[in-house]
Amino acid sequence: MSAKQPNRKPAGKRKESDASAQEGRERKRAAKRKGLKAGSRQQVEQAGKKSGTKQAKDPRIGSRKPVALIVEEKSSKPVAPKQIKEKKLVMTPEQELASIENDDRLNDLLDRLDAGETLEATEQAWVDQRVDRYQELMDELGIIDTDDDEDEADFDEADFDEPGQPASEEELWDRFTQVDYQPEPKPEPKKK
């Protein structure tokens, strides 16, 4: 049969000390009562009145800084408005050329020059600058200025076919074979 097990203490209630019993009772009372005591709002105000040395706390929330109802003008330095940097508009050469051609001031000054008037130094410098820029743009865009009379004298309409009549294939072939085509010589690569 089985061996006899050692005697165990009976599994009864454990004895409590007086202190732990008292703590248990307090916890039980606190658990029964939930929330604040009745009339706690009024009791808080009364507690504030009892301490007469302290100033009564204002229950309102917010700033206690006084607000000026009348606007007073300050006699300080006027603030200079910030200078906004104007971005230069980047224009294409075609747009810039068109703006120079349509410039009323430039056209008026050029008309005065053509009439034989003399311009002030600043106006003359400005006109020269704009005309130079106009020439630069014309060269950059590859536009030939048709206002020159010398170029028109060299132009002979008889040398060109009328645009309405296409050349025959034989004429085109003759023109092609008569052209002396000599390709440009290629530079020799440098030897190291």
Curated annotation (Swiss-Prot):
The keyword Zinc does not apply. Keywords: GTPase activation, Ribosome biogenesis. GO terms for molecular function: GTPase activator activity. The keyword Magnesium does not apply. Belongs to the YihI family. A GTPase-activating protein (GAP) that modifies Der/EngA GTPase function. May play a role in ribosome biogenesis. The gene is yihI. GO terms for biological process: ribosome biogenesis. This is Der GTPase-activating protein YihI. Residues 1-87, 145-192 are annotated as: Disordered. InterPro entries: YihI. Residues 1-12, 27-36 have a biased composition (Basic residues). The lineage of its organism: Bacteria, Pseudomonadati, Pseudomonadota, Gammaproteobacteria, Aeromonadales. Residues 145-172 have a biased composition (Acidic residues). Interacts with Der. Residues 13-26, 183-192 have a biased composition (Basic and acidic residues).
